[in-house]
Amino acid sequence: MLSPQQELPLSEYSSLYDIVVPQDNLLRRINDLVDFTFVYQELANKYCKDNGRTAESPIRMFKYLLLKTIYDISDVDVVERSRYDMSFKYFLGMAPEEDVINSSSLCKFRKLRLEDMDLMNLLIQKSVEIAIEKGIIKSRTIIVDATHTEARSNPYSPIEILRLRSKQLRKVLYAMDDNITQTLPSKNKEDDLAHELDYTKDLLKLITSDASLSEVPAVKQRLNMLKETLSDIEDHYTTSKDADARIGHKTEDSSFFGYKTHIAMSDDRIITAATVTSGEKGDGPQLKELVEQSRKNGMEVNTVIGDTAYSGSENLRLAEDEEKGFTLVSKLHPAISHGLRKDEDKFDYNKDAGMFVCPAGHMAIRKARQGKKDGKWNQSMTYFFDIEKCKTCSRREGCYKEGAKSKTYSIPIRNEEQKRQLGFQKSQEFKDIARQRYKIEAKNAELKQVYGYDKALSYGLDGMQMQGAMTIFAANIKRILKLS
């Protein structure tokens, strides 16, 4: 059962907040900036209003998740810190003496209350609305790019991830006491998961039995991470796989297993739209949705800045549309057009590797320019794929001809739209605007380094979208506070 609204706690100790939580405290400023009643309004229909025991306020539960994102800590740690950190209690709307929730409630809140809702667009729209009200968004330019996030199960096998977490814990212990090595259990040197699980349990048992070690904040944080990893490995045992994650390519020689978050950001560094896809998806096809969503969220878009991945023929035509067009500042690449293929047969261009990726996720192994340079017909760029992969591919029907000795994908170099874009690309105006693209690279780095967005916290596309929504909301709110 859900209470009509979150009630302010009455306590004789509430005056403590005026003493220990200063006016310039980050969490106090966020509380003053954001009216969190929108969370209640969005989630009210997820609760029963007249049956069952009274549920924890959805606003408070949402704030727990926001704290977890801002400080990049685990469920256990955010609840534990809320027990003694007065700024956390103030932010959560708790009385100083009030007890905290059980950390497992956060997992239930994510699964039962936040599923089946467009949390990403809801939170971005709210933060953009606040930025517009504060007069922070002044430009009509957005910068687009994609950032990758490693899946939770990648790139390690169960043994490797256990060893990594154990190593991180031991490193903190060694920093406290060099002689502690003698008391720790012997490392497992065999490539056997059962033995590694036994070693991990022995290590956890030893550390948790010594309060002088387990209660040290740095040790406790690593200890909780190892516990979560152990629990996850035991649930999946020999396999820990994310069914929604896919292999994407950062460069021609390096790849990752996970997801991509496609971001549109204003010139003032406020994220105005975002979509999350599996790792193999191309950047260019997301441009239309990013522009539309930015406009829907209240951003006026006249100019779009992006790298070569966004200068495909479809995007060039979109930019020239009379009603919904914009100035596209994106350098041409001779290999960006999909030609005449159907949507389901399109190959995506990976700007980092400089190669095309087929619908099945396989990247070309080499490329060659074909045709006469000064001939009657335009030259084409031909991409060659690994024929052995094509022979066993589940999507080979209609794509690979049985018995063929090669599989290629060719595209014409420079069409009419590209010719016009090339002329604009040579102008000083293009060069001046393009210099602003560095801002989104800095934003991507901030999301990963400050908010831990380099690694997925859960499995599946839904979990990744939820993580992205909370991360972007936190980043936007902190940016608004900085510019206010």
For the regions a language model picked out, list residue spans one by one.
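Anion-binding and metal-coordination hotspots
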Residues: 74-77, 82, 98-99, 107-484
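Charged, often Cys/His-bearing segments associated with DNA-binding zinc-finger transcription factors
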Residues: 1-34, 41, 396-419
